[in-house]
Amino acid sequence: MRLGESALVVGEVRGGEARALFEAMRIGAAGRVVLGTIHGSGARDTFERVVHDLGVPQSSFKATDVVVSLASLQKTGSLEKTRKVVGITEVGKDWTQTPMEESGFITLGVYAGEVFSVRNLTNSSILKRIAFSKQTNVSELLRHITCGAVFYEMLAQKNIIDMVRFLELKTRFNPIKQEIARSNTKNYAKLAKNELSKILKQYET
């Protein structure tokens, strides 16, 4: 599925399309983002499946920047299952044989004990590349990401799914997000939430 000129998404990768996906990743055919979904329990399992089962060359797997792992989890004493992100792994580029044996996998986030914790973000190569492309630093980029997370979380909580309204809110919130991200305030997430609450109240009245 191509989303305009900025994104290419290939779902349920399990056959010959794997080579096409990784070739698109390697040359950046979609311009900005190339995404694929595949059955695998984590970064290691994904590597094994892509390289050994689907026949993608190991060198081509390096085109992957990040592996996001999801799982269906069941709470103790409950039959209900919820789908959660359980791991975010960056794929380094300085390995020759396998990323598992040469420290090629860098954990950026992991879900354990009902808590999702992040780590190694300031040393992330992919975040440094993104920050460089946006002419900023990793710390400011992380503030942008956090403010963006606040935005999407609050809209999800209020079940705002109308695209017109979503774009209006995003247009109004973006300048505020930019200002907050560039500031040195420590409570930037709380500030973003407060400012977005004000905007949402104006739409509710």
Language-model-derived ranges and their functions:
Residues 17, 42, 137, 162-165:
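Intrinsic-disorder/low-complexity, polar/charged segments
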Residues 66-156:
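Conserved P-loop NTPase
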